[in-house]
């Protein structure tokens, strides 16, 4: 690539100095540029000017797994492409295909190989064909990888560069303030060529957290992003991005280095000729979620996480008071930024986003009503040793068959 873009180089070095103050920013910046614009590919001469031309009220996304449609004869991605062309084209212009890589658990979010499409679904050419017709969203699962993948196997064997790819903790460290999305132990002891190690597992013990202290991890993620873009992905969902940087003795969520990494990704995307939108998946209270706009320097879009639980509460309780109060208090998105409104997702309905919006007794009544309708609730560990509801795991239509007062006789 042509590395003569002074503004891009200078801004990139500024961010890398924030993330890796003890490493040579000039060398790192050169590596970043060579990875993101390899060979004869070059960035734009100027960054894309912030505007709202990237989306409008007419944009809509279908969320689906790659194998939602099966017939025993065709590849699932072939079936999905046919379904989209027949029934969705003209009504929705985007599709979010949940992780389509080989995986070991968590419905795709424990990736074993980032470079391949799950052969049970199809191949990269199938992804590219869907992207030719729709705005395609993919998941960048960047906080963790599968314990059964090649990267972690190489780590356990002590083979470079993977021997430095995973975040190791010490049971004696002060981890009391770490914000958790799960109740499982944070550290997992594993056997390696050099003895036992304790690796960090923010989610499950099959999902081992990557070590972004090592710039090679960031560079590898940039290679993966480039591969997504080259195959037609135009919306990058940054899965669990809030947890990627760790510092014992802190909350280990939303740290300044995390925000600097999101800013770096935004910078690179704004210099691509392809129109790439960054969407952060931050299932947290409102102010924390909005921080990922970063004054127009971070995400192009954030999920409007309070919307699903507040809609559910309004339907169950018969009052839109809390939904209305929240809507009235929401700041408009800044120029070049947007809220992604949604009613439910593969993750369920988050409870953290209504902290400070629903009184605890209203939240608890909503949860109890959902449980009566057959929902499940996943919990998260709190620093004081107790647990709190994290997500309602349910179908939106099923959970709405009960209200605070009775069963809905007209439910279908």
Give names to the regions the model predicted:
Residues 2-412:
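Active-site and adjacent substrate-binding regions of carbohydrate-active enzymes
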């Amino acid at each position: 690539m042509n590395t003569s873009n002074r503004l891009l180089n200078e801004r990139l070095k500024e961010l890398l100095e924030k993330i890796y103050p003890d490493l040579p920013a000039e060398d790192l910046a050169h590596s970043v540029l060579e990875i993101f614009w390899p060979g004869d590919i070059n960035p734009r001469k100027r960054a894309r000017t912030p505007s709202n031309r990237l989306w409008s009220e007419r944009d809509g996304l279908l969320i689906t797994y790659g194998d939602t449609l099966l017939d025993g004869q065709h590849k699932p991605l072939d079936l999905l492409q046919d379904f989209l062309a027949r029934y969705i084209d003209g009504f929705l212009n985007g599709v979010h295909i949940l992780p389509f890589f080989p995986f070991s658990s968590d419905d795709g979010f424990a990736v074993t190989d980032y470079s391949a499409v799950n052969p049970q679904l199809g191949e990269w050419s199938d992804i590219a064909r869907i992207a030719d017709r729709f705005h395609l969203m993919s998941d960048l699962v960047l906080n963790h990888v599968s314990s059964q993948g090649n990267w972690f196997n190489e780590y356990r064997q002590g083979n470079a560069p993977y021997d430095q790819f995973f975040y190791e903790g010490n049971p004696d460290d002060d981890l009391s303030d770490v914000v958790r999305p799960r109740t499982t132990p944070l550290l997992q002891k594993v056997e390696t060529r050099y003895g036992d190690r304790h690796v960090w597992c923010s989610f499950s013990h099959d999902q081992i957290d990557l070590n972004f202290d090592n710039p090679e991890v960031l560079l590898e993620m940039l290679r993966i992003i480039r591969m997504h873009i080259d195959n037609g992905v135009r919306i990058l969902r940054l899965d669990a991005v809030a947890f990627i940087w760790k510092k014992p003795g802190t909350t280990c969520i939303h740290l300044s280095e995390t925000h600097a990494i999101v800013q770096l990704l935004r910078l690179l995307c704004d210099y691509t000729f392809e129109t790439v939108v960054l969407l952060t998946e931050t299932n947290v209270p409102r102010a924390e979620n909005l921080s990922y706009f970063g004054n127009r320097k971070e995400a192009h879009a954030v999920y409007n996480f309070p919307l699903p639980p507040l809609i559910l509460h309004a339907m169950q309780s018969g009052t839109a008071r809390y939904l209305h109060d929240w809507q009235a208090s929401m700041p408009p998105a800044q120029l070049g930024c947007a809220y992604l409104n949604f009613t439910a997702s593969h993750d369920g309905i988050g409870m953290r986003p209504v902290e400070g919006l629903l009184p605890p007794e209203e939240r608890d009544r909503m949860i109890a009503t959902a449980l009566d309708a057959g929902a499940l609730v996943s919990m998260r560990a709190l620093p004081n040793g107790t647990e709190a509801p994290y997500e309602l795991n349910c179908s939106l239509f099923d959970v709405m068959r009960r209200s605070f007062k009775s069963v809905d006789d007209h439910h279908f």
